[in-house]
């Protein structure tokens, strides 16, 4: 059986990779994928702690996080498509050029 410590280490590594990706990359799709990776790392932590403590609350919270992530994915991809149609680029540096 895999220990709680191992799950938390994997979760921390995934979260760190996602954070580095958000800070370093300029492509909006890659940044979006890194944010999703960070959410999945948090979900892994919730599941591991829920299993370790014998409580189902963490697993229920993961379903809420997944629901919010799905809504975020829909809105984020719609914004990226609209931005691509406008600028023909998905570089986040180009977002600064847009005016309201």
From Swiss-Prot:
It is found in: Cell inner membrane. It comes from the Bacteria. The chain crosses the membrane at residues 4-24, 29-49, 60-80. GO terms for biological process: ATP synthesis coupled electron transport. Disulfide bonds: none annotated. Gene3D superfamilies: 1.10.287.3510. Its EC number is 7.1.1.-. Pfam families: Oxidored_q2. GO terms for molecular function: NADH:ubiquinone reductase (non-electrogenic) activity; quinone binding. The keyword Transport applies. NDH-1 is composed of 14 different subunits. Subunits NuoA, H, J, K, L, M, N constitute the membrane sector of the complex. This is NADH-quinone oxidoreductase subunit K 1. It comes from Geobacter sulfurreducens (strain ATCC 51573 / DSM 12127 / PCA). The gene is nuoK1.
């Amino acid at each position: 059986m895999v220990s709680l410590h191992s799950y938390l280490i994997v979760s921390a590594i995934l979260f760190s990779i996602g954070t580095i990706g958000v800070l370093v990359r300029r492509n909006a799709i890659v940044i979006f994928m890194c944010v999703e990776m960070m959410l999945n790392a948090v979900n892994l932590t919730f599941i591991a702690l829920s299993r370790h403590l014998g409580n189902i609350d963490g697993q229920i919270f993961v379903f809420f996080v997944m629901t919010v992530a799905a809504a975020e994915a829909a809105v984020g991809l719609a914004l990226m498509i609209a931005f691509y149609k406008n600028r023909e680029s998905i570089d986040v540096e180009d977002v600064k050029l847009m005016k309201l």
